[in-house]
């Protein structure tokens, strides 16, 4: 099966903030695939890799198109710079939509949290909940006024169900207060940096929200406290040893070595690339594993996590 079967042509581009742009694409030679809130596509990059971007359900978007929101990051490994260099008429290849962050079925209320560019799947969730007529509250947090993308669209979608928070003033997000004010039986959704996700998860569990009602998607891998260094990965099945460079992920190193690896998000939040650790000490940077699982060092997400030891022996 082709990895990037969709051919997308850039129809329009808009600057949502100085660092965030929205892109609207037409699908060349075929119909727009069906998708639901929380879904993403993977856009192929010129270097042979790809990057996931959440699909946007923007108000008044014409039928037959797909929209993305992209943050330009100074520390980007190529994806955001490439996406910000696109112009109307350019063509890219992309995967079919995949959804690892779906809305719950049924009419239970939803409490939505978004941080920074993590608003992209949350905006689509708000649009879907509004269309269903189901109750929700959206808390959108950023560093300072002027830095939050898609505010006019969110106001059109959410009306009074939208709360805006800035770290720089008295509107700063109080997660515990937001949870206390939530409707009974709410599902909790959060997308943003790892710190925000962990804070919402911890507060929700403390409040007694069942784990199966807490849903999240990471929009930035955890930042290492010191520069990364190379290490080795040994495959248990064959004994093959692969060196992972300081600027590579384990998945990238395995692919360079000619190995076929199953993965999706490359952010440490979907669990598809999880594998067992036979020996060595992982440097966990995901948001999937519990604290207890991380301490056990028996599992790791090889899309983002690295090694504290010189070699890892993996159950691959």
Give the ranges of each region predicted by the language model.
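Ferredoxin-reductase
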Residues: 2-91, 95, 105, 142-145
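C-terminal accessory/binding modules appended to enzymatic or scaffolding proteins
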Residues: 229-262
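A short, compositionally biased
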Residues: 36-38, 224-231, 269-271
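Short peripheral tails and domain-boundary helices/loops at the edges of structured domains
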Residues: 61-74, 113-130, 303
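Short hydrophobic/aromatic patches at helix-to-coil boundaries
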Residues: 313-316
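FNR/FR-type flavoprotein reductase catalytic core
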Residues: 80-236, 243
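Local cysteine-cluster metal-coordination motifs and their immediate loop/turn environment
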Residues: 121, 255, 259-286, 294-309
């Amino acid at each position: 099966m082709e990895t990037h079967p969709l051919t997308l042509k850039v129809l329009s581009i808009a600057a949502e903030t100085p660092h965030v742009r929205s892109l609207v694409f037409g699908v060349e030679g075929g119909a727009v695939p069906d998708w639901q809130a929380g879904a993403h596509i993977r856009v192929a990059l010129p270097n042979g890799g790809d990057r996931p971007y959440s699909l946007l359900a923007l108000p008044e978007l014409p039928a037959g198109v797909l929209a993305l929101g992209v943050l330009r990051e100074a520390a980007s490994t190529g994806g955001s710079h490439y996406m910000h260099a696109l112009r109307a008429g350019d063509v890219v290849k992309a995967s079919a939509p995949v959804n690892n962050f779906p809305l719950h079925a049924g009419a239970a209320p939803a409490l939505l949290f978004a941080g920074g560019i993590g608003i992209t799947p949350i905006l689509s969730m708000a649009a879907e909940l509004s269309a269903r007529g189901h109750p929700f509250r959206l808390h959108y947090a950023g560093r300072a006024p002027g830095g939050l993308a898609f505010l006019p669209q969110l106001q059109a979608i959410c009306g009074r169900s939208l709360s805006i928070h800035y770290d720089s003033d008295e509107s700063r997000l109080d997660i515990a207060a937001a949870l206390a004010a939530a409707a009974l039986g709410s599902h909790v959704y959060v997308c943003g940096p790892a710190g925000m996700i962990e804070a919402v998860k911890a507060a929700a569990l403390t409040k007694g929200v069942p784990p199966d009602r807490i849903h999240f998607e990471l929009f930035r891998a955890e930042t290492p406290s010191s520069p990364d260094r190379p290490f080795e990965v040994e495959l248990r099945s064959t004994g093959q040893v692969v060196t992972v460079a300081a600027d590579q992920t384990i998945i990238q190193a395995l692919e360079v070595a000619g190995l076929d690896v199953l993965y999706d998000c490359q952010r440490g939040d979907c669990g598809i690339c999880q594998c067992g650790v036979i020996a060595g000490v992982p440097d966990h940077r995901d948001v999937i594993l519990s604290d207890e699982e991380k301490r056990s060092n028996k599992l790791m997400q090889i899309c983002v996590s690295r090694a504290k030891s010189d070699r890892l022996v993996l159950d691959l």
